[in-house]
Amino acid sequence: MIALYLRSAPARLSAAESGIAAGDAVAAENALHSLKSSSAQLGALRLSRLCEEGETIARAGQPASLASLLRASREELSLVEEWLNAVRAGRTS
């Protein structure tokens, strides 16, 4: 499950970013919804909450408001990836 997440999460966030860049709020909302759910399942709750917030903004038709939230999500995803890689390597306490 961790390996699948590490492969798919960056692509989902990129899909949200691409959706926003293209003015496709529905695509962004769908990508964020998927990332929200998978992040929550693995315990990446801060990233899940950021995605939920982004999903709400996209649904409201305000995709321009998502730029800073997507930057924060990208930073949080980087931390989650580090954490999950440490878990896979047995380096967590």
Residue ranges and their predicted role:
Residues E29-L32, S48:
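Hydrophobic alpha-helical segments characteristic of transmembrane helices
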Residues D24, A31, L69:
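DHp/HisKA histidine-phosphotransfer helix
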Residues A11-A27:
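Helix-loop segments that flank and shape redox-cofactor active sites
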Residues L6-R7, R12, S38-T56, A60-S93:
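Amphipathic, coiled-coil-like alpha-helical segments
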